[in-house]
Design a protein with these regions (language model features):
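Short amphipathic alpha-helix that is part of the acyltransferase structural core
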Residues: 1-36
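A conserved beta-strand-loop-helix scaffold within acyl/acetyltransferase catalytic domains
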Residues: 28-80
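Conserved acetyl-CoA binding element of GNAT-fold acetyltransferases
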Residues: 76-91
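Conserved acetyl-CoA-binding loop-helix of GNAT-fold acetyltransferases
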Residues: 88, 93-107
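Short, high-confidence coil segments that cap the C-terminus of an alpha-helix
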Residues: 111-114
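Conserved beta-strand-loop-alpha-helix junction that forms the acyl-donor binding cleft
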Residues: 117-129, 133
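Conserved acetyl-CoA-binding loop of GNAT-fold acetyltransferases
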Residues: 131-143
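C-terminal "cap" of GNAT-fold acetyltransferases
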Residues: 141-176
Length: 176
């Protein structure tokens, strides 16, 4: 099985990301309108690090976008990495790509020097709550449009070792 995961670095790779996102925007738990999708693509290109996953035929089968730092701190809190979203083609969701992707994501985040990883998930999804609860703790909850989101946090070292005992630690420390 010839999976390959890259970090986007040029226009061709960014175009593949944008095309994949647009074609699969309805696969999110709360589907994106075209207008919202274009906004998230633009924001990802401007602020994010974009990983693309390819199958053995060179077709894009997944993407993950993360930022170094948080928007609340103008991305100056570089000890934090925020995973903005993960999108995997439905045919690959229960494959070994998840494990391969997890390792590659951990490697990419490790290269940033991050100490903490944060991400959000829909509070109503019992599946996501159980999955993410295995390696991260809920540190807050917020209303996002018409649904509630849990905000998760995990130490990078626990993320790499997939599930150490740390649960929480909502550090909202912005460098001055």
């Amino acid at each position: 099985m010839g999976y390959n995961i890259i970090t986007c670095q040029n226009d061709s790779e960014y175009e593949q990301f944008a095309r994949f996102f647009l074609e699969n925007r309805r696969e999110f738990l709360h589907p994106y309108s075209l207008k919202a999708a274009v906004h998230y693509i633009s924001k990802s290109l401007r602020d994010g690090k974009i990983l693309l996953g390819f199958n053995e035929r060179g077709e894009v089968i997944g993407t993950l976008v993360f930022t170094i730092g948080t928007q609340e701190c103008n991305y100056l809190d570089d000890h934090v990495v925020c995973i903005n979203f993960v999108l995997l083609h439905k045919n690959y969701r229960k494959s070994k790509l998840f494990i391969h992707g997890f390792r590659r994501v951990a490697e990419s985040i490790g290269q940033t020097g991050a100490e903490e990883i944060r991400f959000n998930a829909n509070s109503d999804s019992m599946y996501l709550r159980q999955l993410y609860g295995k390696f991260a703790g809920v540190v807050s909850q917020k209303q996002s449009g018409t649904y509630a989101e849990d905000s998760y946090s995990v130490k990078y070292s626990d993320f790499v070792h997939s599930g150490g005992g740390w649960r929480g630690g909502n550090r909202v420390l912005c460098p001055r």
